[in-house]
Amino acid sequence: MNRKIIAIIPASGIGSRMNAALPKQYLTLQGKTILEHTVAIFLNHPQIDKIVIALSANDQHHQHISLLTSDKIQLVNGGASRAESVFNALQSIDEHSWALVHDAARPCLKRSDLDKLLQITDQNGAILASPVVDTLKRAEGNKISHTEDRTTLWHALTPQFFPTALLKQALQQAFDRQQNVTDEASAMELAGYQPTLITGSNSNLKITRPEDLALAEFYLMHSLEK
């Protein structure tokens, strides 16, 4: 199937839970920023035609990253939320393409997982995800209400992969209805689609708290040694 695949990286957040002087995507691992590690995954993949990165309008840090000057990369202004940043990025790409949305703070994506996801051609799209293995408790305040059945529960990861036109339509519909969407799949679900779950590695963690940095560095070091 001959189709254009555009990677979209929303990177306009500040990562307040990191308690760092810089937005978390500009913290360094193995001598490179988290954003550089993330972008390189797609820059080096032969099936990715273009990368669109949504940055805060006030972001000055990206100017010091030479990797972002590649002809394959386009920078756009992000929005007030992740969904708005993705929507802004979608405006700049061909509606006949497929959009591959990935968190800027997930630098440990495995090439094999990405390759599995890119095989999807179903118009419902697909996401990387991992089955829930922990016992989950529903709470009322700080008290346990009941235990959830985890057998059908998955952790949503990224990338998330959808036809561009359908994703744009789904996000616009969610905005119009003032529905809260925390990822692209939730917008597609609200629009009536059923994305496929593709099992991804647990090493594809999202760096959110300071302790995540050491684990991400371990995974990156391990992948470089192979």
From Swiss-Prot:
The keyword Secreted does not apply. One of its GO terms (biological process) is isopentenyl diphosphate biosynthetic process, methylerythritol 4-phosphate pathway. Pathway: Isoprenoid biosynthesis; isopentenyl diphosphate biosynthesis via DXP pathway; isopentenyl diphosphate from 1-deoxy-D-xylulose 5-phosphate: step 2/6. Keywords: Isoprene biosynthesis, Nucleotidyltransferase, Transferase. It catalyses: 2-C-methyl-D-erythritol 4-phosphate + CTP + H(+) = 4-CDP-2-C-methyl-D-erythritol + diphosphate. One of its GO terms (molecular function) is 2-C-methyl-D-erythritol 4-phosphate cytidylyltransferase activity. CDD domains: CDP-ME_synthetase. SUPFAM superfamilies: Nucleotide-diphospho-sugar transferases (SSF53448). The record marks 150, 206 as: Positions MEP for the nucleophilic attack. Its EC number is 2.7.7.60. The record marks 17, 24 as: Transition state stabilizer. Belongs to the IspD/TarI cytidylyltransferase family. IspD subfamily. Catalyzes the formation of 4-diphosphocytidyl-2-C-methyl-D-erythritol from CTP and 2-C-methyl-D-erythritol 4-phosphate (MEP). This is 2-C-methyl-D-erythritol 4-phosphate cytidylyltransferase. It comes from Haemophilus ducreyi (strain 35000HP / ATCC 700724). The lineage of its organism: Bacteria, Pseudomonadati, Pseudomonadota, Gammaproteobacteria, Pasteurellales.
